[in-house]
Amino acid sequence: MSTKNIFFVSFLLICLIPILLSAQDISVHKFIGKTRHDVIKKYGNPVHQDNSNPAMICMFYQTKTNRMIFVSDKNGVYQSEATANYNTESKARNAVDNFISSSVEDGFAVDTVTINDFELSKTGVKADLQMSENKITKNFEVSVKARRSED
């Protein structure tokens, strides 16, 4: 292979591997209190960023099956949301189970509200995890909404 081809392939791999590895990662609650730089380091540059209000800087990420929003101020990320779509209930349920297991390992307490609705908390962070079915598309959506808390 020529040097140009090796360079091109290397560049593609460097750009695509982080995207592929985090394609369905919805653990946005772990970024509460972290800096915008930490978010960009994990997910790359946002698709859109709104810097019009320094007290509420918003970063938006989107792929074909995943949407994420991070809201931050000078003290770090204080609100985050993620939504991932799955074509089967079992894949969505696995995502929920993995999310909960990973969160418990990170020190979060989990409270089951219903079979598809969970509240997670840890000092300084509260999050809601929900799974729902889109009756029209027959897809399943897993969403996380996290926020900084004062406890």
Segments predicted by a language model, with ranges:
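A cross-family detector of function-defining hotspots
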Residues: 34-143, 147-151
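Bacterial N-terminal signal peptides that target proteins for export
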Residues: 1-11
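General secondary-structure edge motif
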Residues: 3-4, 19-20, 76, 83
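Intrinsically disordered/low-complexity terminal segments and short unstructured peptides
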Residues: 2-4, 21, 111, 136
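Bacterial N-terminal signal peptides
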Residues: 10-18
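Boundary of Sec targeting at the N-terminus
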Residues: 23-25
